Curated annotation (Swiss-Prot):
Protein name according to UniProt: Homoserine kinase
SUPFAM superfamilies: GHMP Kinase, C-terminal domain, Ribosomal protein S5 domain 2-like
Subcellular location(s) of the protein: Cytoplasm
Pathway: Amino-acid biosynthesis; L-threonine biosynthesis; L-threonine from L-aspartate: step 4/5
Keywords: Amino-acid biosynthesis, ATP-binding, Cytoplasm, Kinase, Nucleotide-binding, Threonine biosynthesis, Transferase
GO biological process, one term: threonine biosynthetic process
Keyword Coiled coil: no
InterPro entries on file: GHMP_kinase_C_dom, GHMP_kinase_C_sf, GHMP_kinase_N_dom, GHMP_knse_ATP-bd_CS, Homoserine_kinase, Ribosomal_Su5_D2-typ_SF, Ribsml_uS5_D2-typ_fold_subgr
Length: 315
């Protein structure tokens, strides 16, 4: 494996993700066709030098330096591959807003892993990158679909190995994601949850998850509607999202099969048929507007390819 030359550059596209999807807390996530683009370049300097350039309206909220997730992920690749760290510049075209429940942090982790691995000739397998991504993030539901694409169920087996199952998502099932101009940190959303839950609530979630997965596989809206309910995390998190319940109700009244908090929130996911999408989008935006919150609600498809990289040639 050769050290990347000064100026060597790769471009990494990484999709947004929506995690949990109701009952699949910390194990179910899907990639959406909304990408962050990371252009990673070897620059002059030692391995502790890292420069971050953000293109996008919300870049001021992101940190550079040693705490940056792109940098931390790249460092993990150098170490796992037995390579000396190199100085990096990361230019980010930000389309996935941070602290909205759309896996922005996961895009940074995956980009750092994939980009750093590409710069040294891809010595690490995708399975190893997956392991590193989960270790950095602390839970799998965003980083796994961000890396692999599609709808992914991830669980830790009795052997302590992470096992990933790619689940089917019928192409007729569309996602409206209402993204408000308010932020909610994952740590705050996790603090709102209890340490334990009643056994009955866990049983209800298991049944709901089964219905949801079958509904997504077949495109059966009734099954999606019956399955897209949660008792483990959403009852404690809706109160953190200003106008969240109103937005949810507006989506259902406009024809959504089901509605859930996207990840830790505050974005809200509605699943629907394509013909209902525009009306649901408008209804969700209006509902947030009624409580003084600006938002947008794009109609998105499942992104099935996950992250990918390509070399960049200045010529």
């Amino acid at each position: 494996m050769a050290q990347p030359r000064i100026g060597q550059t790769v471009v990494v596209d990484v999709p947004a993700t929506t995690a949990n999807i109701g009952p699949g807390f910390d194990c179910l996530g899907a990639a959406l066709d909304l990408n962050n683009r990371f252009t990673m370049r070897r620059i002059e300097g030692d391995g502790e030098r890292f420069e971050l350039i953000i293109e996008g309206q919300e870049g001021s909220h992101l940190r550079g330096g040693a705490e940056n997730l792109v940098y931390r992920a790249a460092q993990r690749v150098w170490k796992a591959a037995g390579e000396e760290p190199v100085a990096l510049e990361a230019r980010v075209r930000l389309a996935v807003p941070p602290a909205r429940g759309l896996g922005s942090s996961a895009t940074a982790i995956v980009a750092g892993l994939v980009g750093a691995n590409a710069l040294v000739g891809e010595p690490l397998s995708k399975e190893k990158l997956l392991e590193l991504a989960i270790d950095i993030e602390g839970h799998p539901d965003n980083v796994v679909p961000s890396l692999l694409g599609g709808l992914c169920m991830t669980a830790k087996a009795a052997s302590q190995r992470w096992r990933v199952v790619r689940c089917e998502w019928m192409h007729s099932v569309k996602a409206v994601v209402a993204i408000p101009a308010i932020r909610l940190s994952t740590s705050e959303a996790r603090r709102a949850m209890p340490k334990t839950v009643p056994v009955g609530d866990a049983v209800v979630n298991l049944g709901a998850l089964t219905l949801l997965l079958q509904g997504l596989r077949t495109g059966n809206g009734d099954l999606i509607a019956d399955g897209m309910h949660d008792r483990l995390h959403e009852p404690y998190r809706w109160r953190l999202i200003k106008g969240g319940q109103e937005v949810r109700q507006a989506a259902l009244e406009a024809g959504a099969w089901g509605c859930a908090i996207s990840g830790a929130g505050p974005s809200i996911l509605a699943l629907c048929s394509e013909d209902k999408g525009p009306g649901i989008s408008q209804a969700m935006v209006r509902a947030w507007e009624s409580v003084g919150v600006a938002s947008r609600a794009p109609l998105l498809n499942l992104q099935t390819t996950g992250s990918h990289w390509q070399p960049w040639d200045a010529g």
